[in-house]
Regions:
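SET-domain substrate-recognition elements in eukaryotic SAM-dependent protein methyltransferases
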Residues: 1-131
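Residue at a conserved register position within TPR or TPR-like alpha-solenoid repeats
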Residues: 225, 268-272
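TPR-repeat structural position
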Residues: 231, 274-275
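C-terminal SET catalytic tail plus cysteine-rich post-SET Zn-binding segment of SAM-dependent SET-domain
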Residues: 2-12, 104, 110-112, 130-256, ...
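Sequence-level detector for tyrosine residue identity
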Residues: 23, 57-60, 68, 117, ...
Length: 276
């Protein structure tokens, strides 16, 4: 923790809080220039040139008329370098901003159908590493904000992780590694990758008989409560499903943990999430 705080020190305020509105966060993003192709670098250069032209003729660099095609002034060159650098970092550090497509498809026991509005930078989220078997869930709320909750008990000293949309439930190990390397320039070594967790249909589903009966009862209750519009109680019941599995010492990965997580995130989208 001390090492992490030392790295973050230039970006923290007096209360040791990360100021998300501080543009030094953008400057500090990992750029991975060595992983970019010539075409990608050319595209960034062209966009940078367009920005500079717009700033120049918008009067940002002063009222003086500048002939079309004139070389960059020293101020323009500095700003161009900053814009290029920030664009490099943004490439690998964007998060989706989504909304749930239709309330009618939310049943409380199935994955919600969400639509991407766009992408954004969330400096606090960038402090979390990706895991294909993440211990959190997140949704978009109030337009441009994020709500993140634990999907199971996170013990003291355990890393809090995020998922970049590439999950072990839907993609094989090889597919995940390829997608993460291409989209985020890293290879994942989370527990799900090290142990090559199976996909949803192949996950363990066995439970002690009394635990299974209680779990199935809670899940049926969620369907009924969701149908009646009692979504706050659905949230509590989803959490109770997870707590039931933890009390029975059922280790992840397990199909019932994922079923409980689906219920939890469906309820979260219904109660708090953006609507498409």
């Amino acid at each position: 923790m001390a090492a992490i705080l030392s790295m973050l020190a230039p970006l923290l305020n007096a209360d040791e809080k990360l100021e998300f509105s501080d543009y030094r966060n953008l400057w500090s993003l990992t750029a991975h220039r060595d992983r970019k192709t010539k075409d990608e670098l050319l595209s960034l250069s062209i966009r940078t040139a367009v920005f500079i032209v717009l700033l120049r003729y918008g009067g940002y660099f002063g009222p003086k008329e500048t002939p079309y095609g004139a070389s960059l002034s020293s101020a323009e060159a500095v700003v161009a370098g900053m814009i290029f650098h920030i664009q490099e970092g943004i490439t690998f550090n964007l998060h989706q901003v989504c909304g749930v497509v239709s309330d009618s498809i939310l049943t409380g026991v199935a994955a919600p159908h969400v639509r991407e509005f766009g992408t954004a930078l969330f400096p606090t989220l960038l402090l979390l590493n990706h895991a294909c078997d993440t211990n959190t869930l997140r949704i978009n709320i109030n337009g441009n904000q994020v709500l993140m909750v634990a999907k199971r008990k996170i013990r003291a000293g355990e890393e809090v992780s995020d998922n970049y949309g590439i999950h072990y439930l839907s993609l094989t190990l090889e597919e995940r590694q390829e997608a993460l390397l291409k989209g985020f320039a890293f290879c994942c070594w989370c527990e799900g990758c090290q142990k090559d967790y199976p996909r949803m249909k192949s996950l363990r589903s066995q439970l002690p008989e009394d635990t299974e009966d209680k779990f199935d009862h809670l899940r049926e209750n969620i369907k009924e409560m969701f149908r009646k519009g009692n979504h706050e109680e659905c949230l509590k019941t989803s959490q109770a499903m997870i707590q039931l599995l933890e009390k029975a010492r059922i280790p992840p990965p397990h199909r019932n943990y994922e079923l409980a997580s689906l219920s939890l995130i469906s309820c979260l989208w219904k109660v708090y999430g953006n609507k498409a």
